[in-house]
């Protein structure tokens, strides 16, 4: 990846969902990758159903696509750093074999992300001791990532102990900038705090991976009122692709350009593919990028 180069990707989560494997189960890897080509994206992230590296690399090469990274659920606080480091090393070995750029990490200890709990009010909170252990652990995982030619990018996420802008501030302050970077996600920032620019402006120097996720304000407000879980919220359509929600990605993209951001911008929107046709929504995102963003470069 060259200096100041931005690569556009789209996540597999619109086709199949790792949190709910039954969603979109009929969408094959070949179907997903071919849709990505039709929508003119340059790559994707690894989904839970993706095959071993040799098979995946062949399918990617046939379509001239690349892998940006892959989600890793860390349990540093629950299982200890030793166990987390062992599983993360295997994760990085896989990513190295598919020529990825980043390892996406989210601490899932106490997470309500996959539980039937109110995602708006029942998120976990770490103690001071847990924060210290988490930051030390992430520094170590970041070193492992670097040894495999990868950057560890931390994903702030609804329903977890690192969700809010304040929690992201604490994570960034407590970790080594050389080894722990930030994955900035517009949708998670907006739904958590009602603002997506503050985190971007404050931590632009640490951001090495970006998710463009849009939100439907009316659905978000209804889900908040009903106390919905994370899964139920996305099944009801709280998330969508850029150009179909309420986030202004022009100001986000302008700030990234201003600070010479280099790396992936990945379109990501958890939706039920039986309701929101994945290719149709990939094309909505592609058209929005072409018509509203690329003229800013």
From Swiss-Prot:
* Top EC class of this enzyme: lyase
Q: Which GO terms describe its molecular function?
A: manganese ion binding; myo-inosose-2 dehydratase activity
Q: In which pathway does it act?
A: Polyol metabolism; myo-inositol degradation into acetyl-CoA; acetyl-CoA from myo-inositol: step 2/7
Alphabetic keyword roster:
Cobalt, Lyase, Manganese
Q: Which reaction does it catalyse?
A: scyllo-inosose = 3D-3,5/4-trihydroxycyclohexane-1,2-dione + H2O
Q: What does the UniProt note on pH dependence state?
A: Optimum pH is 7.5-8.
Write down the EC number.
Answer: 4.2.1.44
Known Gene3D superfamilies for this protein?
Divalent-metal-dependent TIM barrel enzymes
Which InterPro entries does the record associate with it? Answer: IolE (IPR023952), IolE/MocC (IPR030823), IolE/XylAMocC-like (IPR050312), Xyl_isomerase-like_sf (IPR036237), Xyl_isomerase-like_TIM-brl (IPR013022)
Per the entry, induction is:
By inositol.
Q: Check the record and name the HAMAP family matching this protein.
A: IolE (MF_01672)
> What is this protein identified as?
Inosose dehydratase
Which species is listed as the source?
Bacillus subtilis (strain 168)
What is this organism's lineage? Bacteria, Bacillati, Bacillota, Bacilli, Bacillales
């Amino acid at each position: 990846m060259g200096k100041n180069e931005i690569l556009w990707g789209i996540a597999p989560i619109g086709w199949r969902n790792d949190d709910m494997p039954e969603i979109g189960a009929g969408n094959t890897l070949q179907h997903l990758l071919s849709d990505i080509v039709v929508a003119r994206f340059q790559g994707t992230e690894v989904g839970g159903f993706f095959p071993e590296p040799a098979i995946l690399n062949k399918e990617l090469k046939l379509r001239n696509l690349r892998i940006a990274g892959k989600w890793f659920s860390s349990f540093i606080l629950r299982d200890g750093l030793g166990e987390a480091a062992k599983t993360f090393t295997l994760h990085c070995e896989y990513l190295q074999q598919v020529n990825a750029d980043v390892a996406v990490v989210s601490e899932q200890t106490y997470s309500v992300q996959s539980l039937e709990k109110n995602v708006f009010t029942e998120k976990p909170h770490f103690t001071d001791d847990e924060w210290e252990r988490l930051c030390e652990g992430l520094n170590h995982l970041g070193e492992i990532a670097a040894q495999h030619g990868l950057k560890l990018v931390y994903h702030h996420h609804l329903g977890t102990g690192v969700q809010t802008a304040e929690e992201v501030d604490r994570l960034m302050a407590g970790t080594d900038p050389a080894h722990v970077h930030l994955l900035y996600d517009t949708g998670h920032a907006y739904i958590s705090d009602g603002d997506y620019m503050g985190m971007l402006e404050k931590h632009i120097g640490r951001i090495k991976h970006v998710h463009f996720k849009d939100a439907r304000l009316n659905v978000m407000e209804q889900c908040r009122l009903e106390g919905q879980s994370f899964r139920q919220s996305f099944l009801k359509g709280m998330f969508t692709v850029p150009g179909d929600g309420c986030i202004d990605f022009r100001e986000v993209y302008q700030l990234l350009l201003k600070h010479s951001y280099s790396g992936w911008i990945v379109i990501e929107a958890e939706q039920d593919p039986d309701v929101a046709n994945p290719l149709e929504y990939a094309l909505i995102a592609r058209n929005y990028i072409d018509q509203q963003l690329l003229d800013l470069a």
